[in-house]
Amino acid sequence: MAGAVMLLGVGCREAARPAAESPSGPAGAQARPTKVTLLLNWFPEVEHGGFYAADVHGYFREAGLEVTIVPGGPRSAVVEQVAGGKFAFGVTNADNLLFGQAQGAQAIALLAPLETSPRSIMVHESSGIRRFEDLRNVTLAMKSGAAFEQFLRKRLPLENVRIVPYGGSVAPFLQDDRYAQQAYVFSEPYVAEKNGAKVRNLMLADLGFNPYTSLLIARQKSVKEQPALVRKMVRASQKGWAHYLREPGPTNRRLQEVNPEMDLDVLAFGAKAIRKLAGNNSGGPPGGMTVERWQQLEQQLVDTGQLKPGQTHAGQAFTNEFLDRGRTNPASSSSTGD
């Protein structure tokens, strides 16, 4: 991401461009690959690295798939578009999936490549703020109505904290040592530090808000009617994520090609940061999920008033059925560099 663009172009996530194409044909046809689409929730970045790696390193092709990855943007409705059959697969976060299901969207999570959410609150080192309880006497920029924003408001006293809308830029942060803002640890901190700031990240996961991020989702109908196709997509994506976490360089070059605003330095920074978020503390296969995590998130969204009790069912939000349980934890592999 070039300097000026980087300064102004970092924004909220959950978006997309309109596109077409739904899954078609039986999975596994060897002579002709099955064409499917994958809708991202944002412009291509490291949070999508494993899916691009599956393409770059041929894992989709080996599985008999021809995957078109469709970039997102500021107004995407990934869950709704996947549930409606406009796209075969999508990438979203767990809170957005539950919100979609609450509105009747029949979509389900298949793979959670990141164990820890990258969401953070970025503060200046000079502010003396070392933990969330220290957030006082500051301006705090957050997206109004976001799940994490509502959680923070309920969880913390936020004494003398002036909450303002997040505008997608780190410029105000750079101008005021008493300014804090939402961030993804692999994005905004790099921009701020490149522009001379010394930052500290307070991870939302450490406060207990840790929705699965970069989820691979599909229509529930596809899971029932095309399980072989879904299995191929999930396992190829698992391989892609393992490869990206081990060797991000080739995929970062592809990411830079499809999103020229991201330069290779920020992508290398992001790949290193995201590696720390991968893994699986549940003891299951990489990318696996637990009902306890989904139930915790569901209850948090009920507590903040964003969901009604009984409006969603955590056990129906995901399945680990299609994962390759023989794969090792990708974060435990030694990195071969950029």
Located regions from the model:
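Bacterial signal peptide processing site
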Residues: 11-16
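Compositionally biased, proline/threonine/alanine/serine-rich low-complexity intrinsically disordered stretches
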Residues: 6, 19-30, 328-338
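Bacterial N-terminal signal peptides
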Residues: 1-9
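Pocket-lining segment of extracytoplasmic ligand-binding domains
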Residues: 95, 168-261
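Short, glycine-/small- and polar/acidic-enriched structural segments
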Residues: 20-166, 172-186, 202
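Secondary-structure end/capping motifs
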Residues: 225-307
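Short linear loop/turn motifs
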Residues: 68, 76, 206, 269-275, ...
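Conserved C-terminal helix/tail region of periplasmic/extracytoplasmic solute-binding proteins
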Residues: 295-338
